[in-house]
Amino acid sequence: MSSLKKILGLKGKGKKSKKLGIAPPPYEEDTSMEYAPSAPIDKSYFGVDEMDTHDPNQLRYEKFFFTVKLTVRSNRPFRTYSDVAAAVSHWDHMYIGMAGKRPFYKILAFLGSSNLKATPAVLADQGQPEYHAHCEGRAYLPHRMGKTPPMLNVPEHFRRPFNIGLYKGTIELTMTIYDDESLEAAPMIWDHFNSSKFSDFREKALMFGLIVEKKASGAWILDSVSHFK
């Protein structure tokens, strides 16, 4: 996790990252069930005596490099951004990937959807409507998600079908996100969005399973992730 000093570009004695790398899981492997803790963790249990506990009120800052490439193919042109968001938000259906990166991937999918541009019909595959987005850069995210896991420079690719009302097609999404341990300042991740595509940011974020709140300063923070999306 990056300190606030690093995010704001303030000088200070840098520390080596203690995060360790982990390889992505095989995407072909099926999982029979998903589960979540149903009771508070007992400190007497093995391995949890020095575990970093999650304080839902603690505001943290994560700084990172990111790349997102998004291609959406549909049977008909989208009329509104709400139609686009409804389709793209299905990217993590039956998610198999790095669990710790999933909230950040949700943000990148949301970001990519806001920057989609239609491909000229003459260039589209078999004349079907196609939309593409490619965004990359550095950013930081204020959040209340607790301590984040190691994030190494490992791209992950997702391909999902969608069938939403009148629209059906495929989503292809390639994302990379990894820790930025530099002391250079970075913009907030929300600054990379094309906000002209929608008016209600909180509502559209929720379509991607992101619960956001606005600070007194007017900046958005990621408060939590919805378990229903």
From Swiss-Prot:
Gene that this sequence comes from: M
Q: How does it sit in the membrane?
A: Peripheral membrane protein
Q: Identify the keywords attached in UniProt to this record, alphabetized.
A: Apoptosis, Eukaryotic host gene expression shutoff by virus, Host cytoplasm, Host gene expression shutoff by virus, Host membrane, Host mRNA suppression by virus, Host nucleus, Host-virus interaction, Inhibition of host mRNA nuclear export by virus, Membrane, Phosphoprotein, Viral budding, Viral budding via the host ESCRT complexes, Viral matrix protein, Viral release from host cell, Virion
To what use is this protein put? VSV is used as an oncolytic agent for cancer therapy, because of his wide host range, rapid replication and mild pathogenicity in humans. VSV used are mutated at M51R in their matrix protein. These mutated viruses cannot successfully infect normal cells, being unable to counteract the antiviral state induced by interferon-alpha in normal cells. Cancer cells are impeded with responsiveness to interferon, and then can be successfully infected and lysed by the virus.
Name of this chain's protein: Matrix protein
Q: What does this protein do?
A: Forms a double layer around the helical nucleocapsid, the inner matrix layer binding to the N helix and the outer matrix layer binding to the envelope glycoprotein. Plays a major role in assembly and budding of virion, by recruiting cellular partners of the ESCRT complexes that play a key role in releasing the budding particle from the host membrane. Condensates the ribonucleocapsid core during virus assembly.
Sequence segments annotated as region (Disordered): 1-23
The short sequence motif called dynamin binding sits at 2-4
- Where would you find this protein in the cell? Virion; Host endomembrane system; Host nucleus membrane; Host nucleus
Q: Where is the composition biased (Low complexity)?
A: 1-10
Chain span(s) of sequence motif PPXY motif: 24-27
Q: What residue ranges carry the coiled-coil annotation?
A: none
